[in-house]
Design a protein with these regions (language model features):
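C-terminal/domain-terminus segments
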Residues: 30-32, 57, 156-157
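Short acidic-glycine-tyrosine-enriched beta hairpin
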Residues: 51-65
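Residue-level detector of short, conserved catalytic/binding motifs and their immediate flanks
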Residues: 35, 60, 81
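Short beta-strand His + acidic residue motifs that chelate non-heme Fe in jelly-roll/DSBH
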Residues: 46-48, 64, 69-75
Length: 157
């Protein structure tokens, strides 16, 4: 599944944190009115959203959507980051094949364009998969830094 979003617009992050459950735990049931991004550092998270089950492991990124009920379905230890945010131009994609064709065309236009032109041949709408995996060491330092900035809560952070 893909979500489209306007990359020219920044998300509004409401909450950011890290949780480390060292004893087996199961996610509580809830429906929120914002996106929630989970990034699994270690362990496992067994989560279902609107009845669809997902098994998340270290290195997995997973995006929960607003208005959909999510809850755990199996206990596990889990160490993860989370970010609650809203975005004014983010939505589920109805036709993934058309979205991929659109991305390919944007790439083609970008490659044949003259890079010193003021005019950008593409628009800022792009796509993000609901779930993807990165080797866990690639994202941990960046996420730690983001969490440190959030926790410092300096003026205009």
């Amino acid at each position: 599944m893909l979500l489209s979003y306007n990359a020219d617009l920044l998300p509004r992050v409401r909450m950011l944190g890290r949780i480390n459950y060292t004893e087996p735990w199961i996610h509580f049931s809830r429906t929120v009115n914002e996106y929630v991004l989970y990034v699994i550092r270690d362990g496992n998270m067994y989560l279902q959203e609107d009845g669809i089950r997902y098994h998340l492991k270290a290195g997995d990124f997973f995006l929960l959507e607003p208005g959909r009920c999510h809850e755990g379905y199996q206990r596990a230890t889990c160490n993860y980051y989370y970010a609650h945010f809203t975005h004014p131009a983010m939505a589920a994609v109805a036709d993934e094949e058309a979205a991929m064709a659109q991305l390919a065309e944007k790439r083609r236009l970008s490659l044949i364009s003259y890079n010193l032109d003021d005019e950008d041949p593409t628009d800022p709408v792009t796509f993000l998969p609901k779930q993807f995996h990165l080797p866990k060491n690639e994202s941990n330092a960046t996420l730690r830094t983001a969490l440190d900035c959030y926790n410092a809560r300096e003026e205009h952070y």
